[in-house]
Amino acid sequence: MKSIFKSIDFNGMQVFTFGDKKSKNTILFMHGGAYVNEINYQHFLYCYLLSKKLDAYVLAPVYPLAPLHDVNESIEKITELYKSLIDLNTNLILMGDSAGGGFILSFSQYIKTINLTQPDHIITFSPWVDISMSNSPYNDENDPILGEIGLREIGKSWAGNLDTKDYKVSPLFGDVAYQAPTLIFAGDNEIFYKDIKLYVEKLEENDVNVKFITGKGLFHIYPLFPIPEAKKAFKEVKKEIME
């Protein structure tokens, strides 16, 4: 049976790849998992779907996670990987879910400081935009996946020696000017929803081309689940990338 992915080594970091490197689109997919959990079957299936349906070469790095590592080490490794993708001269997309979504939003701010080009598109599913969880109280009674207390402690570990409101870990507090066109999904029953809304408002205030899609009555990272609403979300992803 032919595998749906390959595993490569990039400067000591394992990277799963899907599709053909000569594809029209290149997607750097940062997986979620609260910065402590590894890539899972949902991510593998979604990356495979992206590669098959969108003429895309998809890379999903196994980046260093808390508590043994923090954001600084991951940013260094992902920066080198990103530089190699710029050289492919394809339609370049940063994509991620949950913590991975928060990472790429912070990363898009970071690369401006080192004069790297922005991607062509940014797409996130339920991004964690404020690891300080400063907009408390959060209503986590309706969220079947996430809880405030645990996330707050994980955020401190991921930040390492940084303040939890540093833009490298909490993109809500960073400079979003000149950010690439951005598509964001969130369910209105997840605890990240109100922080994501604040982030979207900040993008709009800075004239960033942003589209925010709310899943009514839905939950965290709903576009990655096998539900009808996820099919609609995928059509929006395809539209963002292909048009």
Task: Place the predicted regions along the sequence by residue.
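Alpha/beta-hydrolase superfamily serine-hydrolase fold, recognizing
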Residues: F5, F10-F18, K22-E243
